[in-house]
Each structure stands twice: as C-alpha cells, then as structure tokens.
Amino acid sequence: MSDLKKAAQKAIELMDLTTLNDDDTDQKVIELCHKAKTPAGNTAAICIYPRFIPIARKTLNEMGCEEIKIATVTNFPHGNDDIAIAVLETRAAVAYGADEVDVVFPYRALMEGNETVGYELVKACKEACGDDVLLKVIIESGVLQDPALIRKASELSIDAGADFIKTSTGKVEVNATLEAAEIMMTVIAEKNPKVGFKPAGGVRDAAAAEEFLGVAERLLGKGWATPRTFRFGASSLLNNLLHTLELAEAPKGPQGY
C-alpha cells in the first residue's frame, strides 16, 4: 500500500464524520450514520447537533456499530462568554447521550484580553462532562490568527482540563491550517501528550491529511496519533479518501467542510 493510501486509511479511522448544517434532518443524520460505516472500516465518530443524538444512537445500534462515537457541539458556533449557558448546553448534550462534546472557546473574549473566562468556561464544561465524556475545545484558530493567541487559547484549554483541542468550527473563512496545527501540537507536546488534537474544516484530501499526520508524528512521535489523541473533523473528506483507496468514484461538484 502506498504512503498516500496508508494516510487515507488512517484518516478514515481518525475521522469525526460531520454534519452541522442548518437544514439537517433526521434523515440526513441517518444517512451520515450509514456513511460512517465505510468499505475501509468505520470512522471514529460522527459529529452532529445535540437534537439528533437519539436518532443517531438508535441508527448506529440498529447497524451494529455501537463503537462509532457520537460527538456534538455546544457554545457553537460563536464561542460566547456566558459560562452558565455553555454549561447548560453541555449538560444537555451529555443527558442526550453524547460520547464527546466539542465546545467553542470564548475566543473573542481572549482577543479582547480576557483570559479568565475561557479557562473558567472550559473547566466548568469539563466538570459537566465528567470522566466518561470527552471534551474537545474549539479555539477558532482561523479567527485568532495571531500565533500568540493560538498558543494562549491552547494552553488555557489544556490547563482547564480539555481532552482535545480543535482548530475550528468550520463556520468561518479560515479553518484548519498546518501553521495552527504546529502551534497547537507544540503546546500539547509541552504540556500533556495525552491531550488530543483535531483539525476541522479545510482538510480536503489524503495528501492534506498526510501533512497533518506528519506534523503530529514529528512533534509527538510515531504512533501517537490514535482515535484517542487525533481526529479529523470533516464531511467531504471521506469521499476523497475512499477514492484514494479505490473504493469510491471521484467526488463531483463543490466540496463542503
């Protein structure tokens, strides 16, 4: 198997197959669940809005794919600085049955010089998740832009108990970049290599996935990237990976997140 095919295979195993669109329906989520069971193996998780968790759980159970995790989003997509609301949303997501919660860090507050609210929000949301539900913190690196701010958001999130740090919501112009990945995984290497990293949005094909995995290997070592420490947040990427593995036709038309 070529290096590119190996990267494609690994990226599928590390994928949070995502639909976070305003026009999502039960039917679209059911279809997403079926896509997550690919000819090359299952994706690590699906990522959906909280209201769809029950139908997703039912569908995955019926498929015999209970091992596919269900991730959802809170404080999404704007990263407001109201801790109480973020915690209520996170508690509700856990009550719905989420295995993982992707919460948006209050990145605009950080840009205005407030470091405290981000730390406190992540800490409170991790408490709401408990030990059994993973908390991934979206820092919106494409809006932060400044390397010092990307570093600070990563540090605050890890200090507050994040299980993962994630680049992006996929709802802004600039999503996952290799530059942000470098900074974020450097912080992970310095602070706690058990914390995971999730590039989301903008990873379009196997070659791009291979580049992100290359950064992980260089900074954190061969074998570090497993579903417990690395995820790709993506929707259109899956078809490209299956095409690379010669298991699907080439994708047609404009590609999403």
Curated annotation (Swiss-Prot):
SUPFAM superfamilies per the UniProt record, alphabetical: Aldolase (SSF51569)
Catalytic activity: 2-deoxy-D-ribose 5-phosphate = D-glyceraldehyde 3-phosphate + acetaldehyde
Alphabetical list of SMART domains matching this protein: DeoC
Cited InterPro entries: Aldolase_TIM, DeoC, DeoC/FbaB/LacD_aldolase, DeoC_typeII
Protein's GO biological process: 2-deoxyribose 1-phosphate catabolic process; carbohydrate catabolic process; deoxyribonucleotide catabolic process
Enzyme class (EC, first level): lyase
GO cellular component, one term: cytoplasm
Keyword Cytoplasm (UniProt): yes
One term of GO molecular function: deoxyribose-phosphate aldolase activity
Entry annotation: catalytic residues: 102 (proton donor/acceptor), 166 (schiff-base intermediate with acetaldehyde), 198 (proton donor/acceptor)
Gene3D superfamilies (UniProt xref): Aldolase class I
Pathway(s) this gene product operates in, as recorded in its UniProt entry: Carbohydrate degradation; 2-deoxy-D-ribose 1-phosphate degradation; D-glyceraldehyde 3-phosphate and acetaldehyde from 2-deoxy-alpha-D-ribose 1-phosphate: step 2/2
CDD domains: DeoC
Subcellular location: Cytoplasm
Keywords: Cytoplasm, Lyase, Schiff base
EC number annotated for this UniProt entry: 4.1.2.4
Function noted in UniProt: Catalyzes a reversible aldol reaction between acetaldehyde and D-glyceraldehyde 3-phosphate to generate 2-deoxy-D-ribose 5-phosphate.
NCBIfam families according to UniProt: deoC
Family: Belongs to the DeoC/FbaB aldolase family. DeoC type 2 subfamily.
Descriptive protein name: Deoxyribose-phosphate aldolase
Organism whose genome encodes this protein: Shewanella loihica (strain ATCC BAA-1088 / PV-4)
